[in-house]
């Protein structure tokens, strides 16, 4: 569980993280300020424009590199998840590690087919003179807001799909499981993903609200109904899907 304290400066929140299994302190983190979030969004937009130009086949190759990194670091990932959530090792392995590898392989294999241009037939007396094609384009920056109960898999799964489609990602993990979310950023960097393509902001609900204030191009949310309603209302002000 996470406990927030206010620093002496009075404007910077510090998160002290305790393991629910034995209540020992497992980390201290500075929460992102509004200026930090603005900077993160700015860097994400720059990274996304470059990433959108990368051919899909190379985006898929990145996912296979990430699989290798996860396998090489599976013990560390499981330890972080277990410390933050109190999960037993079997659940950490099956829900977080196996599921992440499965998602990476699944979407990397199918994305080239799902995202390729599609020819469509038209209706009408002059349809034989017309040609129609559907082309999929990246949305831009995707904000991924995740809960505590599947902190690694629920962060990496929407990240995989977003990146394959040519988007960049900013993850806002639960304040009680920030390290698991931060692992996703670290793992993609270890797999040689471009700098700032995947970023993480640490903070409470206010940080999540401030992230949406920066108007990402899409929001992926998993969590409670109450929080979902707040996010949906906030997104509706800027028509964010």
PLM region spans:
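N-terminal Rossmann-like NAD(P)+-binding subdomain of aldehyde/semialdehyde dehydrogenases
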Residues: 1-130
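Active-site-adjacent beta-strand anchor residues
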Residues: 30, 145, 170-174, 201, ...
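Short alpha-helical
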Residues: 35, 72, 76, 87, ...
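Alpha-helical structural signal in soluble globular domains
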Residues: 65-69, 80, 101-108, 187-191, ...
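Conserved small-residue-rich beta-alpha loop and adjacent elements
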Residues: 121-194, 238-240
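Conserved NAD(P)+-binding/catalytic subdomain of aldehyde/semialdehyde dehydrogenases
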Residues: 141, 192-241
């Amino acid at each position: 569980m996470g406990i927030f304290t206010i620093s002496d400066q009075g404007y910077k929140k510090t998160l002290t993280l305790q393991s629910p299994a034995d209540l020992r302190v497992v980390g201290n983190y500075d929460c992102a300020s509004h200026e930090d979030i603005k900077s993160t969004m700015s860097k994400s937009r720059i990274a996304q424009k470059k990433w959108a130009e990368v051919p899909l086949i190379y985006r898929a190759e990145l996912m296979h590199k990430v699989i290798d990194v996860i396998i090489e670091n599976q013990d560390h990932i499981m330890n972080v998840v277990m410390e933050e959530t109190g999960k037993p090792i079997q659940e950490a392995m099956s829900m977080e590690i196996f599921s992440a590898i499965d998602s990476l392989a699944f979407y990397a294999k199918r994305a080239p087919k799902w995202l390729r241009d599609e020819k469509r037939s038209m209706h009408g007396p002059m349809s034989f003179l017309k040609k129609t094609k559907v082309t999929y384009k990246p949305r831009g920056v995707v904000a991924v807001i995740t809960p505590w109960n599947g902190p690694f898999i629920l962060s990496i799964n929407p990240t995989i799909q977003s990146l394959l489609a040519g988007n960049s990602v900013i993850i806002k993990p639960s304040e009680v499981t920030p390290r698991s979310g931060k692992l996703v950023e670290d793992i993609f960097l270890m797999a040689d993903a471009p700098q700032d393509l995947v970023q993480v902001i640490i903070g409470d609900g206010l940080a999540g609200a401030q992230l949406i204030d920066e108007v990402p191009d899409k929001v992926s949310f998993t969590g409670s109904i109450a929080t979902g309603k707040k996010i949906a209302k906030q997104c509706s002000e800027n028509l964010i899907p």
